[in-house]
Amino acid sequence: MARNLDPKCRQCRREGEKLFLKGEKCFTDKCAIERRAYAPGQHGQRSGQRLSGYGVQLREKQKIRRLYGVLERQFRKVYAEADRRRGQTGENLLQLLEGRLDSVAYRMGFGASRAEARQVVRHNGVLVNGKRVNIPSYTVRPGDVIELAEGTKGHLRVKAALEAAESRGFPEWIEVDAKAGKGVFKAYPQRSELSATINEGLVVELYSR
């Protein structure tokens, strides 16, 4: 299966902001953005080049892809579905990305990062409505119950991720019983509940060209 093998800290530096790809490290002063807040590469510190309108749109799309750990082909499929749905395409896009099983598992604290949560899903560590689902892109629907498989609940990394997520607080659109390793996806998130640093409108403009 294709994967993005670029170092995670390098990806954050490329986008110029934290994408929270390395779990707890992103919340400490060891985060690469805290230490080297400039683009990677030989000329990163001197990079003052202005992007064209297309370049800005492309950069935003790449940022969202990296944030959610989605490859180009997958992203295009999600965008096409968002465009078919009623409502604003950009908001639909973010809701669909948040509704992926790997994203929901991450939000519920089943992994310290989306990549870690994705691995838990792939290794048959997550149940949806009582049935094992090992497809990270599986679409979770409002009302679905997501829980850790019994054999996964005791994993130290999973327990640590759950504790950290509980201490930070869970998003409003999910309800989690951290002790039971179980939660409910109550609804798709509203735009106001998601990161203000994302400009999904630029992606809509890019695909409308």
UniProtKB/Swiss-Prot annotation:
Q: How does it assemble?
A: Part of the 30S ribosomal subunit. Contacts protein S5. The interaction surface between S4 and S5 is involved in control of translational fidelity.
Instruction: Keyword check for Aminoacyl-tRNA synthetase, yes or no.
Output: no
The alphabetical list of record keywords is: Ribonucleoprotein, Ribosomal protein, RNA-binding, rRNA-binding
Q: Which family does it belong to?
A: Belongs to the universal ribosomal protein uS4 family.
Q: Where is the S4 RNA-binding domain?
A: 99-179
Q: Which HAMAP family is this protein grouped with?
A: Ribosomal_uS4_B
Q: Which GO terms describe its biological process?
A: ribosomal small subunit biogenesis; translation
Q: Which domain of life is it from?
A: Bacteria
Tell me what organism the protein belongs to.
Azoarcus sp. (strain BH72)
Q: Which InterPro entries match?
A: Ribosomal_uS4, Ribosomal_uS4_bac-type, Ribosomal_uS4_N, S4_RNA-bd, S4_RNA-bd_sf
**What Pfam families does the database record attribute to this sequence?**
Ribosomal_S4 (PF00163), S4 (PF01479)
Q: Which NCBIfam families match?
A: PRK05327.1, rpsD_bact
GO molecular function annotation: rRNA binding; structural constituent of ribosome
- CC per GO annotation: small ribosomal subunit
Its recorded name reads Small ribosomal subunit protein uS4
| Functional summary from the UniProt entry | One of the primary rRNA binding proteins, it binds directly to 16S rRNA where it nucleates assembly of the body of the 30S subunit. With S5 and S12 plays an important role in translational accuracy.
Q: Which PANTHER family match?
A: 30S 40S RIBOSOMAL PROTEIN (PTHR11831), SMALL RIBOSOMAL SUBUNIT PROTEIN US4M (PTHR11831:SF4)
